[in-house]
């Protein structure tokens, strides 16, 4: 025990000198460690060489490396425009701009002054009135055209032509008016309730009832009228006002 303690104290008292056994152990450890790192480095280099040379699909692109080395760009996304160039835009800023633009588009009309809104409403009303008036005018023109075409078709119908000719003939065929002498030759009588039938007690010209003492004119068709009412009619037309029977001239 004494020799061991002396040896230990002796080694501690000489810091500048090293133990050959310890140096050999340290050198062997360093050599083993250097050899291990070298082999590991060669193996890692071979793996990189194999990954870069043999499998091109596993080779990371420079863009991905740039993303890996710069984490601040992970929030950016590439946007390819029409010409094919790549542009990196920030996602947060793009979303914010989109929301702001949509907000402006939605609230653009609400931000207009009141006078502008009123003017726009008046313009819309005028345009609507112009469109309605043009539509009504076109409809009116189409109705007029239809009426004219219907009238032309009626005029061209032979049946209506014959009817018109018949009416014209009847009008032209009416008897001429009577002279005053012919009127004076008609049968006259004084009204008496006992002599006249009940259904013939009204004048069909003035629509008044006969009274006792009225002077009446009785035509050949047995219709009786006030003489004052029938005289103008007979001077204009020589037929009965009720049945349109011609009065024979004597």
From Swiss-Prot:
Entry EC number(s): 2.3.2.27
Chain intervals annotated as zinc finger (RING-type): 203-244
UniProt feature coiled coil, ranges: none
Biased composition (Low complexity): 91-102
InterPro entries (UniProt xref): RING_finger_E3_ligase, Znf_RING, Znf_RING/FYVE/PHD
Compositional bias per record (Basic and acidic residues), positions renumbered to this chain: 48-58, 71-80
Bias kind Polar residues: ranges: 1-10
Region feature (Disordered): 1-106
Residue spans of biased composition, Basic residues class: 29-47, 60-69
GO molecular function: transferase activity; zinc ion binding
Functional pathway: Protein modification; protein ubiquitination
Source taxon at top rank: Eukaryota
Function: Probable E3 ubiquitin-protein ligase that may possess E3 ubiquitin ligase activity in vitro.
PANTHER family in the record: RING ZINC FINGER-CONTAINING PROTEIN, SI:CH211-59O9.10
Protein's name in the database: Probable E3 ubiquitin-protein ligase RHY1A
